[in-house]
Amino acid sequence: MKFIAAVPNFSEGRRLDIVDEIANAMAKTPGVKLLAKESDPSHNRSVITIGGDPDSVLEACIIGVKKAVELIDLTKHKGEHPRIGACDVLPFVPFGTSTMDDAKALAEQAGKIIAEELGIPVYFYEESARRPERVDLAYIRNRQFETVRDKVAEDPDLEPDLGPKQLHPTAGAVMVGARKPLIAFNVNLGTTNVEIAKEIAKHLRSKTGGLAFVKALG
């Protein structure tokens, strides 16, 4: 049996009852196992990891996106992490006998459902990107919900790959893609000076001359 993991990121990390409701709804899907659930109140963001056969994982992810649309209002969201959606990022990761093409096909299916059935615009990134500049998740996402919402109708650079040409008023858009496994972690610094954190991140980040393939946010 092919195994696919999905690691949706949700723009809620403080109201843990909401996070639990989303995670539990996804975990009830037959054929899916909840592998991890992590919340960060400073980022106001949660990462939920599920795994299973491709069809079951797809079904669970759509359930998670629907719950996020129902329970998360980005107009009231504040946090340290960039975001453009209630379900902000939806990556599919192949494991075992699954291939990147399997993950890409699943990302395409998910994007189509999110755009056509839920009416939420979709941007494809990483291996699923339809424009070379959008391989980098940050290219769209770092502009933040408010900026993309206000400029998407007039800026061709912000046009979604699928779905409406305007963001959902409270749920924004979803970044969907296939990617390789990713290790993400936080480092606590012994200072309250955010400029020090930004400088360290700059030296680590590949985009600004640091280590290859490393992304960093200070």
Feature-to-residue mapping (PLM):
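Active-site cofactor/substrate anionic-group-binding motifs, chiefly glycine-
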Residues: 22-29, 33, 37-38, 52-83
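Acidic/histidine-enriched active-site and ligand-binding environments that engage anionic O-linkages
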Residues: 66, 72-76, 111-121
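Extracellular glycan-interaction surfaces
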Residues: 48
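Short amphipathic alpha-helices in soluble, non-transmembrane regions
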Residues: 22, 60-67, 104-111, 199-203
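A structural signal for small-residue-enriched, beta-sheet-centric alpha/beta enzyme cores
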Residues: 2-14, 19, 30-45, 78-93, ...
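Residues forming well-ordered secondary-structure scaffolds
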Residues: 101-109, 113, 117, 180
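Short, conserved charged micro-motifs
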Residues: 14-18, 55-60, 98-105, 192-199
